Amino acid sequence: VKEVLTEYELTVDSYEQVRERPMDNELQEKYYSGKKSNHTFKSQMIILPDDQDIVDVIAGELGPKSDITLFRENRERFDAKQKFKGDLAYVGEDLIETPIKKQKKRELNIEQKESNKKFSQARIFVEHRIHSVKIFRVIQERFRLNSKKYEQVMLTICGLVRLRIKALILPEKRHPISLF
């Protein structure tokens, strides 16, 4: 499977979901995200180009963990030659192509802006897929279930989304006794 995926440039993005505040003070500190001003889980999704399928999902990581750290911890799942597209949160990673960042006190020229626009048009599909996962209320709002079940719930919902986009086609079972 890894060799087949190297033909594609996969798209990667991360997002946070608010969770119940842990009782333990040390856990509270680990899960507190200053960005969201709440205790959060962080998840990362990797999809095929043109929104064809969800390739990989990492769920239930600590909220304040950076996107690039999350990617670096899990990149051994893919071939060393695999290429990715990501947003500015992934700047500095050799395997991930990112948009051109504006320099301090300088504007981007027209070619750079056009390049970023084309890049964003190709990368927007991962945002659409994250939105289709967040349609489910359990992922959209505060996660109130047991925190140990977060990954299981997240993977189940991703399976339902794959079924909805017809990326996961189950074989049709036929009953041995038919009326015809």
Give the positions of each predicted feature.
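Short, well-ordered secondary-structure "scaffold" segments embedded in the functional core
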Residues: 1-180
